[in-house]
């Protein structure tokens, strides 16, 4: 874990591996308590961690059932009380007990620390009980720890109660930290005082090399307040305390002191504390990083004893390594002055200066861990990211960096390479990437055009960049080149610093070296080349010039596209504004801050500003997690590219921020097909980078800006087409010609990285239908830092739940082909083409499809050949041009690719022919069904013959687009699929016709008899219960289930009737009056990311009103009057009256259901526990419920209903609906509690005792 620096290497250097810790939801408090307590007592008994036998290092073992148990040797030691007595002899030899549990308990009682369980004090029998009672032994260990803490902290004043002991130790830590803060502030003031007459410094005076220590006044460390044990979780207070007593072992420069502290910062500090305790405390640190980070309540005593042991070491024993600093005597800690508070609290979240003190990836991407006195480069960020894909980040980081370096680039603040390394005692985390100002230096001179904002003022993006660039030259020696970087060693000029690459790069101008892909820190080979400056002099920044990065970043005339810098945290704000912009509007959502804060700004305003910055810091940490996740998905994009292999145009891409592979803008491949992907590397073995002028940089940015503008125009044109298609249906416009949306990918090459799956895969799932997505947000002023994120991928990524979009549920089937005439073409390095009528192929390189895309394929068929974005024909029946997926594999020869194209085109032609034949067959079916409808209508007495004919024509007409949508799906699986579809379609169409006809006939016929009794329709054969498990095994599920999980699947069967197959097809009986649940077919509510509640979607088919009818890319819900008889049958058999014991009652109720002519049945529950009481029928006219079986009120009015429920036949359970209105989607209900009599009737059939 820790490596010592070689002898003579200067300051102390440590190398940590970033730990992998358990998250809080996986952290077991009880297990952590047992592990920490056993580890402590073992170390205390054996006299230190190094003396514990190896077999007892880990007190737990895991059995074959993955259950943890205490090892038998540890159990034997605990049962014999030998372990406790040995621990007592080691810590308190003057009070040695006899080795027996009774003597130990008596001794602890005399010391005032009686171990107790929740029920009673620990007895001797509890300690001897077998199997071992771990709770009793942990109580004894806690009592031992308390007794030892009392003994070790006798010199601390106050009563000897546990809470008082805790408070005394915390007060000791807080007092030490406050005294260290005073000392640090005094030293900072002393260092800053010689720098006061900066403006009057004469250049003629003899000068020396400027050292980094002069910039210490820019920011100060933020020392934490310690009032509770939770304040120790950051590790800052403990590490600062160790530094106070052992400054030579732990330097203050190594401690991360900032506010707020991230988890990464806390882990870094806690590693320092763990390392010190393991090396210098007698019993080490038996607590894990999770224990110190989470500070759970069960480990309170363990933390107190650790503090007590530290106090004993520092204040009582005082070994040789304890050399306490000469701190001011301040037991009464002076409060922080108001001038320091904002800078300390804000320094961690608002300064644009990054400090490489923490071994974690930055929010924008991997950054280089530059540390160490020699300026050695420990690792390459690209290689570190590859290694980080394992179990932990294996980056090695050296510290302290006593020679801090400041370097910057012309990129935005969210770029991978915008790195500035600051003061030694400043913030140590890369999570402090805000746009706030640094702490202003009262006497430093700045450029007149760049005034320093006052404390607390949040500058704009451009001002923040100017602050960065204007602050850099103060660190340069007098007479050095503009872009030279220097690391000043504390040893002075006696040792020339090492250079990571040949020294001729040290004299290159700033614009020549900052605009290259790998950014390095160079060191002068000969310090005498630069003339020294006078003591305390800080050089003024040079004026903006063509070679200055400040001119590139802040000058509006840097290029003709007027680059605007925006932080990564501001991108989400642009999404809101982008919808209101059109054409080539540029989103400029920079933080709005006043020009200058008035001197009368209240303290309340300062506190609110601190809170806001803390919230922003939390938001940045979340964004860092997402950025790391995206980088992990784009593993193949981070390839190490040698700059010597790239020349000419490849260097222009380096100027644009070295966009990682897979995140290049979509338009980049058009104008510059020869650009290669490169990532920022800090490899020490690379050669010098050839110079390049500022003009090339501007030209490259202009080209990319023009490409992005062209893309945005295309996107705007497509958006306009979508808006026209969304016009009211009564006046639809003519269908536009098929417009091709070309998204060119990056040019491939030997070093080219594949596009990230996180960027390219969602684009393939875009539904062709128009959506309510905002106007495409491709900025006109495309700054280089923003080029990392392809704007088109954000526009193309759809929500997974199509059914939740309102516009996808309001269009008739005849509109669907017209609204989806726009095709999507994803090509590799292809310029935009004019719309053509020939079939368009979607070519996606296989390398760009990672595991997430591969997981979506449901079978082993050729990838994507069946998943087409195609609709067969418009409502008029004319075929449209074919469209499908074709995955381009760069490794396969062209002839094989041509064969695949030919096969795909052949399949598409077959689908068109099949659609044509199906339409002809459908016309014949229409005539046959009209005749059948007329014949059935004549059988009903006293009815007009024209009504059923007209009514029956409507459902037949709605089946036409459904048939066209089915054609592509049938060809995907061959003859078996086609035969199955045709057979089940015939069955389904006839059943639907009869159901809808019956819906028309029943209300009229019911007028001649009782409710629901008149006009009885022809009896159909009784069908069995709908078995969802059998449906899941059917070909419809196996062949369509995975297809429907894709948003763009348009060639599937109708969801509302897919389960009505003929009995001889699947061997499963199907209901004839109502379609079962189509939830097995992955309806949109079952898609990943769906947030709809059960009563808001139709996935469970608990009622006729919730069954959707699938008509291509749009899902809408069509209410019908089908019966829920079989849903109730399913509910009674599997939920309400399941099992043998309820079988007689269930059979009686099912017989009543079969006798009844009602359409809608409802179950009465006793209460919300869903206990079956009775079965009711719903009258559609009076909305009253009539009891059919069971016991309960004979009639139930809507006012008596308390709650209504809907049955989910897939999950076999009822779900309460947050409504009170009875409708066809209700399957069960409860009545108000006062309507139930206290005494239940003896049998369900008796109704005399039931409430009326």
Swiss-Prot record:
Coiled coil: 595-629, 696-727, 896-943
GO BP: cilium movement; embryo development ending in birth or egg hatching; epithelial cell-cell adhesion; establishment of epithelial cell apical/basal polarity; establishment or maintenance of microtubule cytoskeleton polarity; in utero embryonic development; microtubule anchoring; microtubule cytoskeleton organization
Polar residues composition bias: residue spans: 335-353, 374-383, 441-450, 525-534, 812-825
Region (Disordered): 183-205, 331-385, 429-457, 479-604, 638-697, 712-935, 962-981, 996-1030, 1063-1114
Bias type Low complexity, positions: 359-373, 740-768
Gene3D superfamilies: CKK domain
Assigned GO CC terms: axoneme; centrosome; ciliary basal body; cytoplasm; microtubule cytoskeleton; microtubule minus-end; motile cilium; zonula adherens
Tissue expression profile of the protein: Expressed at the apical surface of respiratory epithelia, as well as in the acini of submucosal glands (at protein level). In cochlea, restricted to the organ of Corti and increases during development (at protein level). Highly expressed in both sensory hair cells and supporting cells.
Pfam families referenced in this protein's UniProt entry, alphabetically: CAMSAP_CC1, CAMSAP_CH, CAMSAP_CKK
SMART domains on file: CAMSAP_CKK
Keywords annotated in UniProt: Cell junction, Cell projection, Cilium biogenesis/degradation, Coiled coil, Cytoplasm, Cytoskeleton, Microtubule, Phosphoprotein
Keyword Methyltransferase attributed: no
Domain CKK: 1112-1246
Residues bearing the modification Phosphothreonine: 184, 797
Knockout consequences: Mice are viable but show growth defects. Disorganization of epithelial architecture, characterized by impaired apical-to-basal polarity of microtubules in epithelial cells. Defects in the stereotypic positioning of the nucleus and Golgi apparatus. Mice display subfertility in both sexes and severe nasal airway blockage leading to coughing, sneezing, hyposmia and rhinosinusitis. Majority of cilia lack the central microtubule pair in their axoneme and display disorientated basal bodies and defects in ciliary motion, which is no longer synchronized.
Any one Gene Ontology molecular-function term assigned to this protein's record: actin filament binding
Location of Phosphoserine modifications: 193, 334, 347, 351, 368, 373, 382, 548, 555, 561, 683, 767, 812, 881, 1077
The protein's role, per its UniProt record: Key microtubule-organizing protein that specifically binds the minus-end of non-centrosomal microtubules and regulates their dynamics and organization. Specifically recognizes growing microtubule minus-ends and autonomously decorates and stabilizes microtubule lattice formed by microtubule minus-end polymerization. Acts on free microtubule minus-ends that are not capped by microtubule-nucleating proteins or other factors and protects microtubule minus-ends from depolymerization. In addition, it also reduces the velocity of microtubule polymerization.
Subunit structure, as described in the record: Interacts with PLEKHA7. Interacts with CAMSAP2. Interacts with KATNA1 and KATNB1; leading to regulate the length of CAMSAP3-decorated microtubule stretches. Interacts with AKAP9; regulating Golgi assembly in epithelial cells. Interacts with MACF1. Interacts with isoform C of CDH23; leading to inhibit CAMSAP3 ability to induce microtubule bundle formation. Interacts with AKNA.
Similarity-based family: Belongs to the CAMSAP1 family.
Protein name: Calmodulin-regulated spectrin-associated protein 3
Organism of derivation: Mus musculus (Mouse)
Source species taxonomy: Eukaryota, Metazoa, Chordata, Craniata, Vertebrata
């Amino acid at each position: 874990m820790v490596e010592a620096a070689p002898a003579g290497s200067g300051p102390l250097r440590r190398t940590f591996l970033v730990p992998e810790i358990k998250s809080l939801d996986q952290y077991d408090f009880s297990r952590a308590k047992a592990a920490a307590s056993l580890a402590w007592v073992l170390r205390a008994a054996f006299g230190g961690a190094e003396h514990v036998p190896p077999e007892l290092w880990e007190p737990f073992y895991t059995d074959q059932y993955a259950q943890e148990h205490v090892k038998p040797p540890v159990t034997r030691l605990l049962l014999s009380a030998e372990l406790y007595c040995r621990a007592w002899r080691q810590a308190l030899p003057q009070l040695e007990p006899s080795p027996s549990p009774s003597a130990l308990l008596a001794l602890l009682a005399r010391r005032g620390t009686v171990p107790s369980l929740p029920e009673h004090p620990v007895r001797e029998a509890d300690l001897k009980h077998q199997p071992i009672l771990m709770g009793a032994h942990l109580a004894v260990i806690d009592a031992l720890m308390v007794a030892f803490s009392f003994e070790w902290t006798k010199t601390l004043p106050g009563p000897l109660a546990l809470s008082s002991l805790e408070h005394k130790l915390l007060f000791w830590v807080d007092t030490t930290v406050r005294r260290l803060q005073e000392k640090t502030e005094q030293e900072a003031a002393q260092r800053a005082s010689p720098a006061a007459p900066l403006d009057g410094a004469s250049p003629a005076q003899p000068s020396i090399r400027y050292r980094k220590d002069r910039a210490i006044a820019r920011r100060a460390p933020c020392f934490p307040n310690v009032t509770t044990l939770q304040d120790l979780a950051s590790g800052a207070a403990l590490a600062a305390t160790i530094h106070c007593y052992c400054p030579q072992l732990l330097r203050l420069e190594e401690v991360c002191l900032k506010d707020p502290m991230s988890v990464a910062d806390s882990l870094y500090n806690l590693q320092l504390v763990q390392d010190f305790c393991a090396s210098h405390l007698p019993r080490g640190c038996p607590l894990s990083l999770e224990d110190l980070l989470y500070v759970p309540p069960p480990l309170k005593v363990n933390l107190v004893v650790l503090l007590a042991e530290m106090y004993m070491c520092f204040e009582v024993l005082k070994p040789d390594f304890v050399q306490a600093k000469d701190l001011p005597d301040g037991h009464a800690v002076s409060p922080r002055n108001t001038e320091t508070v904002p800078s300390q609290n804000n320094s961690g979240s608002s300064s644009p200066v990054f400090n490489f003190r923490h071994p974690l990836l930055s929010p924008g991407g991997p950054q280089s861990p530059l540390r160490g006195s020699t300026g050695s480069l420990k690792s390459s960020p690209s290689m570190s990211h590859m290694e980080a894909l394992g179990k932990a980040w294996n980056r090695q980081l050296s510290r302290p960096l006593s020679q801090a370096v400041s370097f910057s680039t012309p990129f935005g603040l969210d770029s991978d390479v915008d790195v500035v390394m600051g003061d030694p005692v400043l913030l140590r985390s890369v999570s402090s990437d805000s746009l706030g100002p640094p702490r202003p230096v009262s006497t430093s001179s700045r450029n007149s055009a760049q005034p320093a904002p006052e404390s607390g003022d949040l500058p704009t993006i451009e001002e923040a960049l100017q602050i960065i660039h204007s602050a850099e030259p103060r660190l340069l020696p007098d007479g050095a080149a503009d872009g030279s970087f220097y690391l000043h060693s504390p040893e002075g000029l006696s040792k020339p610093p090492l250079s990571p690459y040949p020294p001729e790069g040290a004299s290159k101008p700033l614009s020549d070296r900052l605009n290259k892909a790998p950014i390095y820190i160079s060191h002068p080979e000969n310090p005498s080349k630069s003339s020294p400056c006078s003591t305390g002099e800080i050089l003024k920044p040079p004026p903006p010039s063509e070679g200055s990065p400040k001119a590139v970043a802040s000058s509006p005339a840097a290029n003709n596209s007027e680059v605007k810098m925006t932080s990564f945290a501001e991108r989400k704000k642009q999404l809101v504004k982008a919808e209101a912009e059109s054409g080539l509007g540029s989103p400029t959502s920079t933080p709005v801050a006043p020009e200058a804060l008035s001197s009368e700004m209240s303290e309340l305003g300062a506190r609110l500003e601190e809170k806001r910055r803390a919230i922003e810091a939390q938001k940045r940490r979340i964004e860092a997690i997402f950025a790391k996740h995206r980088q992990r998905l784009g593993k193949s994009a981070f390839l190490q590219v040698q700059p010597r292999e790239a020349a000419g145009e490849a260097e222009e891409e380096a100027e644009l921020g070295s966009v990682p592979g897979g995140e290049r803008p979509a338009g980049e491949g058009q104008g510059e097909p020869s650009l290669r992907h490169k990532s920022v590397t800090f490899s020490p073995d690379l050669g010098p980078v050839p110079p390049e002028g500022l003009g090339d940089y501007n030209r490259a940015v202009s080209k990319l800006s023009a490409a992005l503008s062209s893309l945005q125009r295309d996107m705007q044109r497509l958006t306009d087409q979508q808006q026209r298609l969304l016009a009211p249906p009564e006046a639809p416009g003519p269908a536009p010609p098929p417009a091709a949306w070309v998204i060119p990918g990056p040019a491939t090459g030997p070093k080219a990285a594949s596009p990230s799956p996180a960027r390219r895969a969602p684009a393939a799932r875009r539904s062709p239908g128009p959506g309510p997505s905002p106007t495409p947000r491709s900025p006109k002023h495309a700054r280089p830092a923003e080029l990392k994120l392809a704007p088109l991928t954000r526009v193309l990524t759809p929500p997974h739940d199509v059914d939740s979009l309102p516009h996808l549920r309001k269009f008739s089937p005849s509109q669907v082909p017209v609204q989806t005439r726009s095709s999507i073409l994803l090509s590799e390095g292809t310029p935009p083409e004019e719309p053509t009528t020939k079939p368009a192929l979607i070519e996606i390189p296989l390398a760009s499809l990672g595991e997430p895309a591969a997981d979506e394929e449901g079978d082993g068929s050729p990838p994507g050949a069946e998943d087409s974005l195609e609709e067969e024909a418009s409502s008029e029946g004319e075929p449209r041009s074919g469209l499908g997926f074709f995955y381009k594999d760069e490794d396969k020869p062209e002839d094989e690719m041509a064969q695949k194209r030919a096969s795909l085109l052949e399949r598409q032609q077959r689908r068109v022919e099949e659609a044509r034949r199906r339409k002809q067959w459908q016309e014949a079916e229409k005539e046959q069904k009209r005749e059948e409808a007329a014949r059935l209508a004549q059988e009903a007495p006293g009815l007009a013959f024209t009504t059923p004919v007209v009514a029956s024509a409507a459902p037949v007409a709605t089946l036409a687009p459904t048939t066209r949508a089915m054609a592509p799906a049938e060809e995907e699986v061959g003859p078996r699929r086609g035969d199955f579809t045709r057979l089940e379609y015939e069955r389904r169409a006839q059943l639907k016709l009869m159901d809808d006809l019956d819906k028309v006939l029943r209300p009229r016929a019911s007028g001649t008899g009782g409710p629901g009794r008149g006009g009885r329709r022809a009896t159909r054969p009784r069908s069995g219960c709908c078995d969802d498990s059998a449906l899941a095994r059917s070909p419809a599920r196996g062949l369509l289930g995975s297809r429907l999980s894709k948003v763009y699947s348009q060639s599937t069967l109708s969801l509302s009737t897919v389960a009505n197959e003929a009995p001889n097809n699947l061997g499963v009986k199907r209901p004839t009056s109502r379609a079962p649940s189509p939830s097995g077919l992955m309806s949109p509510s079952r898609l990943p990311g769906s947030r709809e509640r059960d009563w808001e979607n139709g996935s469970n088919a608990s009622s006729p009103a919730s069954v959707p009818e699938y008509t291509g890319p749009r899902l809408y819900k069509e209410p019908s009057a089908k019966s829920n008889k079989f849903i109730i049958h399913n509910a009674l058999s599997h939920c309400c009256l399941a099992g043998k014991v309820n079988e007689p009652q269930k059979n009686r109720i099912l017989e009543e259901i079969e006798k009844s002519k009602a359409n809608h049945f409802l179950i009465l529950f006793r209460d919300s526990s869903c206990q079956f009481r009775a079965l009711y029928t719903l009258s559609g006219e009076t909305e009253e419920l009539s009891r059919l079986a069971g016991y309960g009120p004979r009639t139930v009015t809507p006012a008596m209903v308390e709650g209504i429920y809907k049955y989910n036949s897939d999950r076999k359970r009822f779900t309460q609906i947050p409504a009170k209105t009875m409708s066809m989607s209700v399957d069960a209900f409860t009545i108000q509690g006062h309507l139930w009599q206290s005494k239940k009737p003896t049998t369900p059939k008796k109704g005399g005792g039931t409430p009326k």
